[in-house]
């Protein structure tokens, strides 16, 4: 089980993803914007940040950069529905960040998250 912070501004997508990740055995906290997500990263340790790239206030790329400074070792996965934004996230995101383009299958999301978490072990030191 991993601790995942989900930052997604679309309410239905956020609820859908959160529910799917909990069913996959992960502990999930979710927020609807980058600023709230950053505050939560400062207060708690997470294994993975799953962030939409396009959000109000602070986009997912800036959130990921700041999250990596606050919590070195956090893994980052971006989700986006825009091809150009996906390329930007891949080029400007933290080292090792992955990009998953919408639409995607939940199996694909869970498989990619599990693969990321297996690379080094949980960032928080918990299993």
What is each of the regions a protein language model found here?
Residues 55:
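Receiver (REC) domain active-site loop signature in two-component systems and cognate sites
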Residues 8:
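Conserved acidic carboxylate
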Residues 109-121:
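Receiver (REC) domain switch/output surface
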Residues 33-36, 59-63:
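Acidic catalytic/metal-coordinating carboxylates
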Residues 15-23:
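Charged docking surfaces used in two-component/phosphorelay signaling
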Residues 52, 80:
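Active-site residues of response regulator receiver
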Residues 5, 29-48, 69:
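Acidic, metal-coordinating helix/loop segments flanking the phosphotransfer/catalytic sites
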Residues 62, 75, 82-101, 107-111:
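Alpha4 helix (beta4-alpha4-beta5 surface) of REC/receiver domains from two-component response regulators
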């Amino acid at each position: 089980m991993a601790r995942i912070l989900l930052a997604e501004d679309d309410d239905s997508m956020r609820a859908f993803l959160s529910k799917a990740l909990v069913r996959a055995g992960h502990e999930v906290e979710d927020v609807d914007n980058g600023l709230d997500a950053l505050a939560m990263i400062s207060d708690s340790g997470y294994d993975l940040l799953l962030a939409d790239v396009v959000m109000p206030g602070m986009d997912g790329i800036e959130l990921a950069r700041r999250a990596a400074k606050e919590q070195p070792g956090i893994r980052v996965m971006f989700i986006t529905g825009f091809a150009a934004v996906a390329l930007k996230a891949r080029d400007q995101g933290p080292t090792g960040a992955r990009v998953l383009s919408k639409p995607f299958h939940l199996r694909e999301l869970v498989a990619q998250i599990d693969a990321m978490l297996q690379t080094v072990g949980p960032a928080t030191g918990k299993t």
